[in-house]
Amino acid sequence: MDDRDVPRVIILVVMSLVTAVYLCALTVVNVALPQMQGALSATPDQISWVITLNLVATAVATPLTGWLVAKWGQRKVLIWCVSGFSITTYLCATVSSLEPLLIYRIGQGAFGAPLVPIAQAVILNAYKEPDKRAVAMGIWGMSVVIGPGIAPALGGYMAEEYSWRWTFYLLLPVSLAALIGVLAFIRESNDAKVSKLNWTGFIALSIAVTCFQIILDRGERLDWFENTGILVLGIVLLFSFYLFFMNSLYSKNPFIKPQLFTDRNFSLGLFFVFIYGMLNVTPTVLLPTMLQDYVGYPDSDIGFILAMRSVGIFLGFLVAPRLSKIDPRYCMALGLFAIGISGIVSATFNSQITVFFVSWVGVLQGLGCGLLWIPLSLVTFATLRENLMADGTAFFHLIRNYGSSIFIALNVLVVLRTSKINNSELSEIANPYNERLTLPDAQTSFNLDTTEGLISLAQEITDQAVMIGYLNSFILYALGAIIPIPLLALIRKNPPSKKS
């Protein structure tokens, strides 16, 4: 079956569908959180656990993917995971209180976590020729973009017109189609015999990633390590990671196979997928809030801007396979450079920017991400042995997810902390003794002799301080893209052939 082109195309379509439905579940729920909060009589802090626990379950289950595939095979694991994902998705839509929803969201994350790494491993094993593999990665990458891009808009419409429950119901037809595709077209892989699961390593790593994810997700809300709970989680994180590290060094059967990291391109690929995770998701978190709250864009304009970013990614996926034939490192460098330029330009935004200007910056940023992803996927797995592919793709996506989580948390910290500094500095300038405030233009904007004028000036100072905070985060974003470029020289252009 794997030797003929037509079945391989079907495999690619099925795996793209599997990937899209899981990634849609990650983004579609966000738009319905306010409505869910009211319907389930939850506080903002309580409803935030709907997202947090799903991310924790995903982080814990992802490293287990390789062992699951080795023990039961990719077909069985896919069937179980897609089935479990479909059932928990349906159950999420039927709850009447918060507690069962949290339980089902944990199940949704745990069943969904292996889907993306297994899908990538199946495609990589089906398309072994470098040129065809590049095209396949491009097509699969489009499912990563199109699904999560459409889902929030469709989910928001369904939640507004009907109920928040429809954000889960709309996933069911797609997940059932994915299950039928897996049952009909995915065959068993020839993976090596599984060794006994290293429970010490798995439990230690699970505790570490759980603590880390909760710290990242709730740290800013709880004032980081000033909070006793966050401090305790940090201590547990360090201890459990130390235990995992020592177990990996001295165990005869470590949970994460050390052979993975003897592959030079794979190890470098992990570094660059961390960078990709940093750069790909962060703008979709920062831009909507900034544009809506401090520039005054309506939801429709923000949706258009995000759609244009998806267009840029789509164009990158079209171009990257051709450029990668010349040298994948050049394509990656061009992608990082485009992302860096978009960050530099974003750092010039102000409250008067037009939708057109922000849109073309989004296209450039999306183009860079598209140019980076395909060659990154190619060089990372070019020499990895087939029996390590499931472990490799699982670790690959775990690192990508943590790149996103860490950089988002860092950028939010930069925005909030520098906004306070900016507010203090601007407030010092805006005082009755500043001669600039006595000029005619200033008097027209802010009448300091009235309470309304003082309130208006204070609000303007706050808005400008936060805006400068966002600009600082865009500078950090640009540096995150440009600084790693020289390290691309360490990647082998034509690595030796891998051995099974």
Residue ranges and their predicted role:
Residues 44, 74, 98, 130, ...:
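Membrane-helix interface/capping residues of multi-pass secondary transporters
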Residues 12, 48, 74-79, 101-102, ...:
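Hydrophobic/aromatic positions within or immediately flanking transmembrane alpha-helices
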Residues 138, 160-272, 276-279, 305, ...:
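Hydrophobic transmembrane-helix bundles of small-molecule transporters
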Residues 8-24, 29-33, 40, 44-53, ...:
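12-transmembrane solute porter fold
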Residues 122, 126, 157, 185, ...:
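A residue-level signal for alpha-helical anchor/packing sites in multi-pass solute transporters
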Residues 395, 399-493, 499-500:
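Hydrophobic transmembrane architecture of multi-pass small-molecule transporters
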Residues 62-200:
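Helix-loop-helix hairpins in multi-pass membrane proteins, especially solute transporters
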Residues 56-60, 90, 145, 149, ...:
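Hydrophobic/small/kink-forming positions within alpha-helical transmembrane segments
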